[in-house]
């Protein structure tokens, strides 16, 4: 027997596969959309569909209307009564017999027409009324079969008929007029499509199968025990039909349109409110879950948040958080992670990662620079003077330059890095003067990085000091030669050999001992040995053969930067190679700009400058950081883009580092949450001093007091700085800067703690005092007396009283005591009673007998030792 696929049959009858499977289940054929059926099963399905199509013709249509209103009635008593009135109207519309005849003429081969079904239903109802408990007429089987078939399928066909007649508007050909309330007529347009010949055969076969099926149901009904069971069944059937009819009228008979091509349209004269039929939406969005993991190609350009990384990988953020937890990272959905970690997570989850470098523009702008002819020429040497504080570094430079810079410095100590150049024997030498204070470590490190030769100044009366050792370490790390200048030889102290011996510990050997270091004895006060030192510098520089490119675009290093009140951001730079011209576009760290002015160390305006010459430049967009590299570029727009990108990158790294530190120190923060802290706002004249002050103050933090620098900057104290300090209860520290008029008014109004300083160690000393005042004092117990127990008495009020003699010190009442027996402490308590004979006394001195009463202790023995303590407060 030929087998037919369910999907092919669905295409043949113009029906969805799922709908056809449901039809098969209704008639008892259990199939899925991938199964096949036989010819007999196909015939059964087609008969069922044709039966539904045949019975889709509806004869009766009921319309129900309700009108509610309220009527006010005036009574004689003056009170009004409201009566609710409800008017119900039922309209019944039916088709004429001519329409039924027309339908039957076109379906001659159908064995059972609609009129016969109605008549058989009436006879069937009479038979059911005469049904009794004893016997049942055997003819009921046939009529009940028809009735059951009609009751089951006729209502369904009525629903299908309404929808099919609505969809086929073009084939309406008949209108029925029915008068209102059995007199009015309504026009119907009814078109019956030509049924295919094969559908007629299928329908007749379906009738036979349905009769057999319904006969089985009736036989089950006839076996019911009594009439009451039958009445219950009949009542349930009627209620069910009524519910279905109301539901179908409410849903406007919305069924599959491919089962019929008929439609009904009521005239506008009948309808005051049109019936709105809604079609079932055929467009449905179906989500198909992927069967396997999808690996994507992810492009990572920079640091990225967890949320954005999840969007790129098309996964939930929680999955990435779980993955990072397994890798040992604790993150949140909005936390930013760096490029390396994001790449690791993406590759761990099976995705392919492509790294896109956003600094391509920076690389391009650096490659596009003009390096001139590339010929290197001899350049002046850069000499950095280093040493301990107050060893005479600035005085030595003043003697060489014939200036008096040291006399004008606050506290006679250098706190800024200075850059000068002088001409000796037609040769230029550049000097960098570095601070010697311990706070200026970063300045000394920058000086050692850019220098060619280091002059280490050591005072003959002081010898080797901590900053001397630090300067040696910086110079050795930069691999630059060191010339030792032993200063203050005008003092009658012969300590040179001792200094040489101490320097050997740090690999500094004089030439006469077979080493590479030149030792020169000088006096910055009298000028003795200065000429020898300069000759040693020139000799050492010739040996180094210092050369660089003297033309092309310049590049150098920022030595110091500050904000000039009249000129704006100013940077002291040292050109390493190339030539800097006025009007060049420069890129310096996070800043950029066009060079508006170039000034040398004597404040002379110059148009261009070559290598190894320190100058001041104006025109930058902001204050650069000391130590930033400065280069000349071609395009100002590209320089601005690179500077903006660097700022963005720096902020992302800073935020990521802060979040990481917070997550690592979360438990320590909980412990320290109750500890006090000191908030500070710092404003300085130059960038280097600001860096040194911040570094020194942060080192003062301890376990109990934490130093928080909530704001810092270069320039004068503004209104914004004062408001920040007032809001956070902070101290404002001004180093060689002053507050403007508006800031002074707010300082007085808000009573902000504001302090001026010109010497860095004054800041450190005062902050130390503030921290000591904030620390909680510590207490220490000190032994003030010893007593030996000689006898024991009993008192009804106090208890046991020890008769003692004071052996050392003094015994005071209400002091803390400690009882020792055989040099072992057996009790610690309080002395509550002290008597001399029968008098109460406050203290007893050495060699005097007394009676001592102790609190909550009676186990005292003769020859016990009583130690008396006093609590002393110790300030931190």
From Swiss-Prot:
The keyword Cell division does not apply. GTP binds at residues 387-394, 433-437, 487-490. It comes from the Bacteria. One of the essential components for the initiation of protein synthesis. Protects formylmethionyl-tRNA from spontaneous hydrolysis and promotes its binding to the 30S ribosomal subunits. Also involved in the hydrolysis of GTP during the formation of the 70S ribosomal complex. It comes from Buchnera aphidicola subsp. Baizongia pistaciae (strain Bp). It is found in: Cytoplasm. Keywords: Cytoplasm, GTP-binding, Initiation factor, Nucleotide-binding, Protein biosynthesis. GO terms for molecular function: GTP binding; GTPase activity; guanosine tetraphosphate binding; translation initiation factor activity. Residues 378-547 form the tr-type G domain. Residues 523-525 are annotated as: G5. This is Translation initiation factor IF-2. Residues 387-394 are annotated as: G1. The keyword Transcription does not apply. Residues 412-416 are annotated as: G2. Residues 433-436 are annotated as: G3. Its main location: cytoplasm. The gene is infB. GO terms for cellular component: cytosol.
């Amino acid at each position: 027997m030929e087998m037919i696929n369910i999907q092919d049959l669905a295409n043949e009858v113009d029906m969805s596969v799922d709908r056809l499977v449901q039809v098969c289940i209704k008639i008892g054929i259990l199939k899925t959309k991938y199964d096949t059926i036989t010819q007999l099963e196909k015939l059964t399905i087609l008969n069922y569909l044709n039966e539904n199509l045949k019975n889709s013709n509806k004869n009766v249509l009921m319309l129900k209307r309700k009108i509610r209103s309220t009527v006010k009635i005036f009574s004689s008593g003056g009170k009004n009564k409201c009566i609710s009135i409800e008017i119900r109207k039922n309209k019944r519309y039916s088709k004429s017999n001519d329409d039924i005849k027309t339908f039957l003429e076109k379906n001659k081969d159908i064995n059972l027409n609609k009129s016969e079904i109605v008549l058989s239903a009436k006879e069937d109802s009479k038979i059911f009324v005469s049904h009794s408990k004893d016997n049942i007429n055997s003819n009921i089987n046939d009529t009940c079969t028809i009735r059951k078939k009609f009751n089951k399928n006729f209502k369904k066909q009525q629903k299908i008929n309404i929808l099919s007649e609505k969809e086929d508007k073009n084939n309406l050909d008949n209108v029925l007029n029915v008068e209102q309330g059995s007199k009015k007529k309504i026009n119907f347009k009814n078109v019956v499509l030509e049924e295919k010949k094969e559908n007629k055969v299928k329908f007749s076969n379906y009738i036979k199968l349905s009769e057999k099926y319904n006969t089985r149901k009736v036989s089950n009904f006839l076996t019911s025990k009594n009439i009451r069971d039958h009445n219950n069944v009949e009542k349930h059937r009627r209620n069910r039909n009524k519910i279905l009819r109301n539901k179908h009228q409410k849903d406007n008979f919305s069924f599959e349109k491919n089962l019929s091509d008929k439609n009904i349209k009521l005239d506008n004269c009948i309808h005051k409110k049109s019936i709105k039929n809604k079609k079932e939406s055929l467009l449905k969005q179906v989500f198909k879950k992927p069967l396997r993991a999808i690996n994507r190609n992810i492009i990572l350009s920079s640091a990225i948040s967890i949320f954005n990384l999840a969007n790129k990988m098309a996964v939930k953020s929680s999955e990435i958080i779980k993955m990072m937890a397994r890798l040992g990272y604790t993150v949140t959905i909005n936390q930013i992670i760096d490029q390396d970690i994001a790449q690791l997570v993406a590759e761990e989850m099976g995705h392919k990662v492509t790294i896109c470098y956003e600094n391509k523009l920076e690389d391009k702008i650096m490659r596009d620079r003009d390096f001139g002819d590339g010929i290197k020429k001899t350049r002046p040497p850069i000499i950095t003077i280093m040493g301990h504080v107050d060893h005479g570094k600035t005085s030595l430079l003043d003697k060489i330059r014939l200036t008096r810079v040291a006399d004008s410095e606050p506290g006679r100590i250098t706190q800024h890095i200075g850059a000068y150049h002088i001409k000796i024997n037609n040769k230029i030498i550049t000097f960098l003067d570095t601070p010697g204070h311990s706070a200026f470590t970063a300045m000394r490190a920058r000086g050692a990085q850019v220098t060619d030769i280091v002059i280490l100044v050591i005072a003959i009366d002081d010898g080797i000091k901590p900053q001397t050792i630090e300067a040696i370490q910086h110079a050795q790390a930069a691999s630059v030669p060191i010339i030792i200048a032993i200063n203050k030889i005008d003092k009658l102290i012969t300590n040179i050999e001792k200094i040489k011996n101490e320097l050997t510990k740090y690999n500094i050997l004089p030439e006469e001992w077979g080493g590479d270091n030149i030792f020169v004895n000088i006096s910055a006060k009298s000028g003795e040995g200065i000429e020898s030192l300069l000759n040693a510098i020139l000799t050492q520089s010739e040996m180094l053969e210092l050369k660089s490119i003297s033309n092309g675009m310049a590049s150098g290093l920022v030595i110091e930067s500050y904000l000039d009140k009249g000129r704006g951001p100013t940077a002291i730079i040292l050109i390493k190679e190339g030539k800097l011209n006025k009007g060049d576009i420069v890129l310096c760290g996070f800043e950029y700009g066009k060079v508006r002015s170039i000034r040398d160390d004597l404040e002379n305006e110059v148009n261009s400058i070559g290598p190894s010459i320190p100058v001041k430049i104006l025109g930058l967009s902001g204050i650069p950081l000391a130590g930033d590299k400065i280069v000349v570029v071609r395009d100002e727009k590209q320089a601005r883009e690179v500077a903006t990108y660097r700022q963005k990158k720096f902020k992302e790294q800073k935020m990521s580092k802060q979040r990481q530190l917070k997550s690592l120190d979360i438990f320590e923060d909980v412990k320290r949450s109750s500890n006090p802290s000191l908030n500070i706002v710092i404003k300085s004249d130059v960038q280097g001093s600001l860096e040194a002050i911040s570094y020194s103050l942060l080192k003062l933090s301890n376990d109990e007091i934490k130093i928080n620098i909530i704001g810092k900057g270069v320039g004068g104290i503004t209104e914004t700085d004062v408001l920040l300090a007032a809001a956070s209860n902070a101290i404002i520290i001004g180093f060689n800067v002053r507050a403007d008029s508006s800031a002074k008014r707010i300082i007085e109004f808000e009573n902000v703690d504001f302090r001026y300083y010109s010497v860095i160690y004054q800041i450190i000393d005062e902050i130390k005092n503030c921290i000591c005042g904030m620390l909680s004092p510590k207490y220490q117990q000190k032994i003030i007396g010893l007593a030996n127990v000689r006898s024991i008495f009993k008192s009804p009020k106090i208890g046991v009283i020890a008769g003692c003699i004071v052996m050392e010190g003094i015994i005071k009442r209400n002091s803390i005591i400690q009882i020792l027996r055989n040099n072992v402490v057996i009790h610690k308590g309080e002395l509550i009673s002290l008597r001399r004979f029968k008098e109460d006394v406050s203290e007893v001195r050495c060699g005097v007998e007394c009676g001592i009463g102790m609190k909550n202790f009676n186990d005292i023995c003769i020859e016990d030792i009583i130690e008396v303590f006093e609590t002393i407060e110790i300030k931190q």
